[in-house]
């Protein structure tokens, strides 16, 4: 193979390369998946993709790729994941029994965790089942306590009403209906509050990651400036040493010429006698 021959990268990404790409995207997901579209965010996303490509190419056993190829691969993975999750939602198949998921999607849960807001209406809600059973158990226990209260009321008779008050006592069915309404209204409120906290957490994480990337850029710029100053100082030192060496050679040649014209023995001869 000649030295000037260019090695072309592989056309398709291997499973190892996709895993490395997913790990790096998860590292910078709060910047790469930020919904802001201003010029500063777009420029920051591009610099982040370039940094991601540098980290990707530094990994062993991967083909060299530029940030455009990595970005296109990530967009294809997202589109494929959304399509299969929508198919899963429509067909209502179990996750373990779908051959399409196991053969075409790489780390579906990991990808969906990077896109919580975009896939909110596509993925099936497995987390809601424990809350539903918990509420049902609480309602069942509350109904049992209501039945015991009604039996006690039948056994001991109605409670005496204080004079001067005309408020009727609530029946067991009214108490049960009110409790059920409270449970129904409490669950959506908790879900909305939880979603609001998650969105706030994601925004804070994106802001922190943006700050870290900006601090890293400032640090890299300072290091580059120090390196340039060191190079300039080395160049200045080299020029000074060259000037000093030339001066040294000049005075050595001058000394040799002076020694040839005026040898040392000529100074040892006696002076002639004056008349």
Curated annotation (Swiss-Prot):
Superkingdom, taxonomy of origin: Eukaryota
Residue list for modification Phosphoserine: 96, 98, 274
UniProt keyword annotations, A-Z: Coiled coil, Isopeptide bond, Phosphoprotein, Ubl conjugation
Coiled coil: 211-247
Covalent link location (Glycyl lysine isopeptide (Lys-Gly) (interchain with G-Cter in SUMO2)): 154
Domain Myb-like: 13-78
InterPro entries from the UniProt entry: Myb_DNA-bind_5
Similarity-based family: Belongs to the MSANTD3 family.
Record protein name field: Myb/SANT-like DNA-binding domain-containing protein 3
Organism: Mus musculus
């Amino acid at each position: 193979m000649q030295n000037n021959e260019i090695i072309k990268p592989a056309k398709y990404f291997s499973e190892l390369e996709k895993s490395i790409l997913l790990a790096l995207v998860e590292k910078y997901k709060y910047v790469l998946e930020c919904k802001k579209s201003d010029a500063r965010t777009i420029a920051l996303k591009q610099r982040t993709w370039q940094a991601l490509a540098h980290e990707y190419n530094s990994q062993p056993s991967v083909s060299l790729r530029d940030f455009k190829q990595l970005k296109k691969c990530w967009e294809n993975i997202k589109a494929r994941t959304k399509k299969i999750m929508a198919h899963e939602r429509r067909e209502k198949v179990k996750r373990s029994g779908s051959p399409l998921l196991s053969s075409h999607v790489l780390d579906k849960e990991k990808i969906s965790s990077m896109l919580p807001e975009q896939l909110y209406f596509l993925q099936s809600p497995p987390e809601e089942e424990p809350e539903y059973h918990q509420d049902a158990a609480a309602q069942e226990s509350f109904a049992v306590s209501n039945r015991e209260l009604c039996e006690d009321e039948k056994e001991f008779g109605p409670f005496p009403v204080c004079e001067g008050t005309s408020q009727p006592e609530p029946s067991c069915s009214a108490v049960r209906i009110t409790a059920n309404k409270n449970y129904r209204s409490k669950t959506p409120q908790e879900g909305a509050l939880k979603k609001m906290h998650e969105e706030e957490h994601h925004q804070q994480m994106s802001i922190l990651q943006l700050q870290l990337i900006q601090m890293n850029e400032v640090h890299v710029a300072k290091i580059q400036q120090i390196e340039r100053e060191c190079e300039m100082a080395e160049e200045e030192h080299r020029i000074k040493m060259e000037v000093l060496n030339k001066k040294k050679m000049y005075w050595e040649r001058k000394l040799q010429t002076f020694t040839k014209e005026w040898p040392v023995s000529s100074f040892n001869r006696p002076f002639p006698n004056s008349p």
